[in-house]
From Swiss-Prot:
Its main location: secreted. Glycans are attached at residue 45. One of its GO terms (cellular component) is extracellular region. Salivary chemokine-binding protein which binds to host chemokines CCL1, CCL3, CCL5 and CCL22. Disulfide bonds join 38-59, 55-96, 72-101, 91-110. It comes from the Eukaryota. Pfam families: EVA_Class_A. This is Evasin P546.
Amino acid sequence: MKVLLYIAASCLMLLALNVSAENTQQEEEDYDYGTDTCPFPVLANKTNKAKFVGCHQKCNGGDQKLTDGTACYVVERKVWDRMTPMLWYSCPLGECKNGVCEDLRKKEECRKGNGEEK
C-alpha cells in the first residue's frame, strides 16, 4: 500500500510541475486516484522538483502517510489552501518520518502552481 501511495504521489508531483511549467489549468476530475488514495498537495521550487506539503492526510475516511525519508515542506494544509498561486514564499524543508514532516532547519523558495485547487 505504501509503495502504491508513493508511486501515485510521485506521479502527482510530476503532474503538478508540468501544470505549473505550462501555466495551464487541469480539472481534478480528469485524474483517477482510485478508491483509497487522494492527491497530496505539492509546492514547486526553483529546481523544478516539487515537494509534498506535509506527510499525512485524511482520505476517504482513512489516513494516508508518505514513506519515511520523502522530502516535504513543513507547511500545514490550511496554509497551503491560502497561498497565492505563483507567488514565491520561504518554505521550511523537511523529511517524512512516521507521517510527520520533520523540520530540517533549512528553507528554500517555493510556490503554489496556477492549477492548484483548495
